[in-house]
């Protein structure tokens, strides 16, 4: 992640285009903005990665690496569940729905924050840097990386913009899914989920 949020966001956008994940002729939104405080319209521009100090870049790359590691562990363990269902012959008889409740979290600063320091950003160096991600630590990655995670949209969690509300929903249910491996651009909302599960269970 030392490449920085500008280069990585561009690379993610190119992959989205190559995979044809979006309809029409979408464009990558400009580099994001940083909300001055939660639920307020006042913002300031997100700084370019190359404008940051080396210490800031190293701290921020570590924050994103920690988040990516958590996602990787989650993915591996979801895979373990799926493998067990396959082994028991139950995968095609199991309805799996995987989704997110909102877009990436930009709290509370372009550079993130730590549980120990509250909303204030602190650049970790030396031994502090080595301790990041260990038990007892708590680091948010901030607006810069949230802008990457919401590629190609604008804004973040808390906001009724695409970056806050447009998230993937992955569904698996054997032969009940007609378009296996395909994309469906039909909008859905969390209020749809309960009624869907009730119907599938044959309940009323």
Question: Could you tell me what each predicted segment is?
Answer:
Residues 1-50:
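Long, well-ordered, tryptophan-enriched scaffold segments
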């Amino acid at each position: 992640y030392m490449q920085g949020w500008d280069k990585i966001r561009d690379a993610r956008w190119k992959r989205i285009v190559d995979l044809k994940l979006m309809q029409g002729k979408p464009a990558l939104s400009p580099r994001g903005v940083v909300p001055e405080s939660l639920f307020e319209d006042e913002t300031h521009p997100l700084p370019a990665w190359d404008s940051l100090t080396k210490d800031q870049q190293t701290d921020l790359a570590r924050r994103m690496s920690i988040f990516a590691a958590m996602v990787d562990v989650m993915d591996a363990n979801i895979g373990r569940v799926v493998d067990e269902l396959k082994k028991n012959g139950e995968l095609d008889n199991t309805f799996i729905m995987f989704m997110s409740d909102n877009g990436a979290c930009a709290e509370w600063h372009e550079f993130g924050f730590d549980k120990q320091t509250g909303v204030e950003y602190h650049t970790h160096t030396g031994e502090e840097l080595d301790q990041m991600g260990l038990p007892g630590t708590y680091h948010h990655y901030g607006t810069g990386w949230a802008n990457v995670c919401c590629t190609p949209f604008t804004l973040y969690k808390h906001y009724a913009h695409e970056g806050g509300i447009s998230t993937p929903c992955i569904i698996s249910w054997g032969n009940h899914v007609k378009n296996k491996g395909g994309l469906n651009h039909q909008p859905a909302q969390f209020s749809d989920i309960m009624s869907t599960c009730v119907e599938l269970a044959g309940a009323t």
